[in-house]
């Protein structure tokens, strides 16, 4: 049995939309590129054809990955998110003692992690350290830049 892919409802919708886009729009675009490249003649030295076939393989691989993820998806129901401790699906405001600043993180499954938008995986060092902790707790986390201390200020949906 495959490992469940933990997703928020928002993450599920994004993956479903990406899958639909790849299956409808991108597949058709690549098929047209392949058709045009074939019209150039000799396929043995046809870089346009090779590029289109590589793009097709990438898209088909991504489609297969998304289908597998969605098949094994376990969606976190917002009603099930408890605010007494940090869990997947909640947003946590922390005070970073190392950098003297407040930061907010949304804890998500690894499939929808987006660190640039402060959506961190439950499997990341910070995500692991925060899971199960309560408001007022202080955690030390080893990150590439060293060890940071985070004090949990607020937990919300």
UniProtKB/Swiss-Prot annotation:
**Coiled coil stretches, renumbered:** 12-74
Q: Name one Pfam family in it.
A: GreA_GreB
Gene Ontology biological-process annotations = DNA-templated transcription elongation; regulation of DNA-templated transcription elongation
Q: Which domain of life is it from?
A: Bacteria
Q: InterPro entries recorded for this chain?
A: GreA/GreB_C_sf, TF_GreA/GreB_CS, Tscrpt_elong_fac_GreA, Tscrpt_elong_fac_GreA/B, Tscrpt_elong_fac_GreA/B_C, Tscrpt_elong_fac_GreA/B_fam, Tscrpt_elong_fac_GreA/B_N, Tscrpt_elong_fac_GreA/B_N_sf
GO terms, molecular function? DNA binding; RNA polymerase binding
Record's SUPFAM superfamilies? FKBP-like (SSF54534), GreA transcript cleavage protein, N-terminal domain (SSF46557)
What's in the keyword line of the UniProt record? Answer: Coiled coil, DNA-binding, Transcription, Transcription regulation
**Role played:** Necessary for efficient RNA polymerase transcription elongation past template-encoded arresting sites. The arresting sites in DNA have the property of trapping a certain fraction of elongating RNA polymerases that pass through, resulting in locked ternary complexes. Cleavage of the nascent transcript by cleavage factors such as GreA or GreB allows the resumption of elongation from the new 3'terminus. GreA releases sequences of 2 to 3 nucleotides.
By sequence similarity, the record places it as follows:
Belongs to the GreA/GreB family.
UniProt-listed PANTHER family:
TRANSCRIPTION ELONGATION FACTOR GREA
| Name the UniProt record assigns to this protein | Transcription elongation factor GreA
Q: Which organism is it from?
A: Thermoanaerobacter pseudethanolicus (strain ATCC 33223 / 39E) (Clostridium thermohydrosulfuricum)
């Amino acid at each position: 049995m495959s490992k469940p892919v933990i997703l928020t409802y928002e993450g599920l919708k994004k993956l479903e939309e990406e899958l639909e886009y790849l299956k409808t729009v991108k597949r058709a675009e690549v098929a047209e590129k392949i058709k045009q490249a074939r019209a150039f003649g000799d396929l043995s030295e046809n870089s346009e054809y090779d590029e289109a076939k590589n793009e097709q393989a990438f898209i088909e691989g991504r489609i297969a990955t998304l289908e597998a993820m969605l098949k094994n998806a376990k969606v976190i129901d917002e009603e099930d998110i408890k605010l007494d401790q940090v869990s997947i699906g909640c947003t946590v405001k922390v005070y970073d003692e190392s950098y003297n600043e407040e930061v907010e993180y949304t804890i998500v499954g690894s499939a929808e992690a987006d660190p640039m938008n402060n959506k961190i995986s439950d499997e990341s060092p910070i995500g692991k350290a925060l899971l199960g902790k309560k408001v007022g707790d202080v955690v030390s986390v080893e990150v590439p830049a060293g060890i940071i201390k985070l004090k949990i200020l607020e937990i919300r949906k």
